[in-house]
Amino acid sequence: FIPTFASHGFRYVEISGNGCDISKDMIISVDGLAISNIDIVTGEFECSNSLINRLQHNIRWGEIGNFLLIPTDCPQRNERMGWTGDMQVFAKTGAYNMNIKSFIDKWLDDLIDAQTMYNKNGAVPDTAPLGGDNRIDGCGGWGDAATIVPWEMYETYGDIHILKKCYDMMKKWVEYQSSTDRRNYGVRTVDGKEVPEQSDLATIPYIQVQQCRGDHLTYDNSTPYIYSATAYAAHSADILRRTAYILGKTDDEKRYTELFENIKRAFNDAWVNDDGSVSYYGEVSSQTAHCGESVALDGSVTRYTYYAENTPHCPSQTAYALAVDFDLIPTDKLKNTREYFKNSILRNNCKLTVGFLGISHLAPALSKVGLDDVAFKLLEQEDNPSWLYSVKNGATTIWERWNSYIAETGTFGDVSMNSFNHYSYGAIGQWFFTDILGICPVEFGYKSFMLSPKFGGGLTYAKGSFTSPYGKISSAWKLHDGKFTYDCTVPTNTTATLKLPNGDIHTLVGGSYHFEINV
């Protein structure tokens, strides 16, 4: 079976007429052929946990089913649009799993067209091509696909054409963000009330003021829109300054380096405390929050009320993930921030609360500050909300919501918007490659790269590969009798820097290698 003229996602099919008068043929079996614009597998991953293996399968299967003409959010309902937020969080995972270079190159043309056609000020609509319920004025974390996706593609494939083609779009988006910050809008009101003076948000320049989708479908709704939008504005400015350097645009590099530092400074003035913790105040968002307890470094516990006026909230997993992964925390505060970040996970019993904007940054941020053990606990969590909860309950692709289906009560999430094939939360897949296998580019396109495998949780082995533009990179490790054995393959004409778990560092050229260390 193969669809003609239209494609619809489905899981089950009913065949009627078999054995009746209308059919003289006996149907023995039916093969359904998936329609997709991507068919070259570039990433393989396997480990000792069968549920994680199924999760990896579901991530890839959802990618294949949604990458048709445009990266749709879901293939089975009346939406099926190229949501920018979905694509930017999944871009790196998608590029590890499959060769998406040509597919995304075409979609970036759609994104450029959408920006050019619908907003002359540089805003990026929420979908490309434009359609349905979205904002042509763009919003933080979604319009940032204009910078993030080209950058991720350049990192993976090393094709400078991508940056050259997209540079004007990237620059227009960052300039648009700059035009919508506090310097140009003055005091912000939410639901008719001014942002509280205690937070200093009413006067700090470079803070984003746009109201937008924020950390979409988060479980605790406690990350203010302007927090995530400002964090992403800093990240886009950072990407643009690096892009300007690569393209030899010296004046732009200087300008956007300064802009990044200014936004970072404003972010810290608004939300980062002297002790490295993050806090924000109730009236910065109209969302309803649930945040529980905050545990300070000295072990003292504070329970915050729920969006009471001028009351600081215990920050979300997303709040810390964005601040850490975007390098917004000053170095002298990072050690303390690490502990608060860890607590944001542990106080929720190692269950997820992140939404769309936090999902791709949570595990990488934890690893960045040496909290690999916490990242493994999150990955191996089987209770809701978690990545493996859907797997345990029969999912074959990634759910749109953490609570798309609750087995314990037999209930479904909001049926008006509840997709069972929605790739965004599959963004954890990048961490399988970058951290468990340890395959990361150093030189764009993997001319040189890192191999820094990590073990943790209950895993006893992991193995996999990534086919880079220079050839297949393989990485495999195993734990046995107190020893860590590691095998890898480095493509010809490339160089790898291997960092083993005990800290040993080796420089490798093309060939296959075997290592064994005590752990």
Predicted regions and their residues:
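Extracellular polysaccharide-recognition and catalytic grooves
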Residues: 285-286, 298, 311-417
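Well-ordered alpha-helical scaffold segments within catalytic/enzyme domains
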Residues: 89-100, 146-162, 232-250, 319-332, ...
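Extended acidic/polar, glycine-enriched regions
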Residues: 1-49, 510-512, 516-519
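Short beta-alpha connecting loops at secondary-structure transitions
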Residues: 44, 131-135, 211-225, 278-282, ...
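Non-catalytic C-terminal accessory modules of carbohydrate-active enzymes
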Residues: 373-519
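Secondary-structure capping and boundary motifs in well-ordered enzyme cores
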Residues: 5, 51, 79-83, 135-145, ...
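Active-site acid/base region of carbohydrate-active enzymes
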Residues: 22-58, 64-65, 71-89, 93-126, ...
